[in-house]
Amino acid sequence: MDLAAVVLAAGRGTRMKSRRPKVLHRVAGRPMVGYVMEAVREAGANRIIVVAGYGHEEVAAVVNELGGEVVVQEPQLGTAHAVLQAEEKLADHRGQVLVVCGDTPLLRGETLSKLAVRHREADAAATVLTAFLDDPTGYGRVIRDAAGRFVRIVEQSDGTPEELAVREVSTGVFCFAAGGLFECLRRISPDNQQGEYYLPDALIVYLKNGLTVSTCPVEDPAEIYGINDRRQLAEVERLMRSAVLDYWMGEGVTVVDPASTYIDRAARIGRDTVIHPSSFIEGDSVIGEECEIGPNARLVRARLGDRVSVQYAVVLDSTIGERTTVGPFAYIRPGCEIGAGVKIGDFVEIKKSVVGNESKIPHLSYVGDAVIGEKVNVGAGTITCNYDGKKKWTTVIEDGAFIGSNTNLVAPVTVGRGAYVGAGSTIRRDVPPGALGVARSDQKNIPNWETRIRHEKKDNRQNNDK
């Protein structure tokens, strides 16, 4: 099947009240135009042309990364005019052309495949994807004759009361035979209240020339739900999120409270993992089997091995090995590689660091720009002092080292294999393997301090009373 697709994405989306092009607003972690491109590709489209307008450079950056091409519609004179902008790109195309809207992220590839099949079976010049809606407000109505044959599509602003009472609507999705399409579009006139060139008017041109226009109903009208404002964006997000959660529960993942769980479409989760309430799994995060996520966890582009626990914690752009526990109240910043069997405890922040297998950073520590070996113990209150005001420096803690509580490691510095650092130390020079490093002032005890303080307080009170 020689199938191309034109995605209409030129509108600014004024009701969104946003500087961002409408089709780049995200649903379940992806720009909505990405879902539409995925759907037409699943339907068999081997070439995807996206018609952009407002913010076309931003749109092109996303579309090109997803394997599509962009043409610019300027000025924006309607949907037929938009499709005409793809003429040069499709000059040699001889098959079929799908035309879809870039703001319908729930549209499925299976539905578009059925549309293309119906189009071929009917030997039609054009086929319209239609839907029956309880409230068709805002959609073009499908008008038929007494025999049920397609006659035309009437836009909301142009319809009579009788026409606007029709519940069958055009979804804005079409399949055209490429031959003659652009010639047909050039014959359309802007005879409507908006003064625009409407794509549905091409159907009238076809019918006047004795060509066939067929229709294909969509099974689930939710698929054609378009996004024009923030409320609709939230509703589509809800529908998409529900579908994603339903899929993963069907794949053996426990979601304790779907109402408070957010999983992006690109995420991957292993079986027997449990997702607790108020958890967010974003981007292309990958979670292994038998993990415990949450409650109150946020994972962004994270890679987790099997049997990892993340509770009340944030993990960003980092890798965590199997059997590791993170949290509560831990913060794993981008660029971290955490090994297997590691403990990252409460109020620990790690940034751009490597932590070896079976090491422990149990609580109240900052580890930045560090390389920590295997079976290292980092005591409470340990700080890697990695920044001198101009440059970030590396701290190295080799295998089996023991760092006492309340320690400052002033980078660049290395604590050797099996070495110890005494609690309360500020380490500025390397500690050799197997050695004990201690760097702190000697303790000084002042006798009778409590008695002295008590007398000073009494004298102060007497002076204040005078």
From Swiss-Prot:
Its main location: cytoplasm. It is found in: Cytoplasm. InterPro entries: Bifunctional_GlmU, GlmU-like, GlmU_C_LbH, Hexapep, Hexapep_transf_CS, MobA-like_NTP_Trfase, Nucleotide-diphossugar_trans, Trimer_LpxA-like_sf. Acetyl-CoA binds at A380, N386, Y387, S405, A423, R440. It comes from the Bacteria. Residues 252-466 are annotated as: N-acetyltransferase. GO terms for biological process: cell morphogenesis; cell wall organization; lipid A biosynthetic process; peptidoglycan biosynthetic process; regulation of cell shape; UDP-N-acetylglucosamine biosynthetic process. Residues 231-251 are annotated as: Linker. Pfam families: Hexapep (PF00132), NTP_transf_3 (PF12804). PANTHER family: BIFUNCTIONAL PROTEIN GLMU (PTHR43584:SF3), NUCLEOTIDYL TRANSFERASE (PTHR43584). NCBIfam families: glmU (TIGR01173), PRK14354.1 (NF010934). Homotrimer. This is Bifunctional protein GlmU. It comes from Desulforudis audaxviator (strain MP104C).
